[in-house]
Amino acid sequence: MKQYNILMIMADQMHKYALGKIAPYVKTPNLDRLAGEGTLFRNAYSNNPVCGPFRGILYSGMYSRDNGVQKNDEALSETEVCLPQELQKCGYTTSFVGKLHLGGSGNQPIPKKYWAGHEHFLGYQCYNG
């Protein structure tokens, strides 16, 4: 079976009409090409609109009340099995680039325990408080 590449792009507060593939008056040629060659979710909803808790839900597959990330500045448990670890079991190499927002300090290197299971990490934390 062919193993496909998985590229997950997360943007904070990006409305669906900020993508040219859906709203032609917006120019996003690279994102449009990715959406045209991959999967585009036209009706996706978040059950938690806050950055850190949503990322905790996405990575753990559990509601905020169950994964322990109910507000920004909280981290997933070190024992939590996350999406990157499940992908590794299927032979994928996982990497993260950008803002993770799942624990650690915005002013210090991020300890591996906060990498949400990624093998490679080039990221930072961002706290809005």
Show where each model-derived region lies.
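Formylglycine-dependent sulfatase
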Residues: 1-129
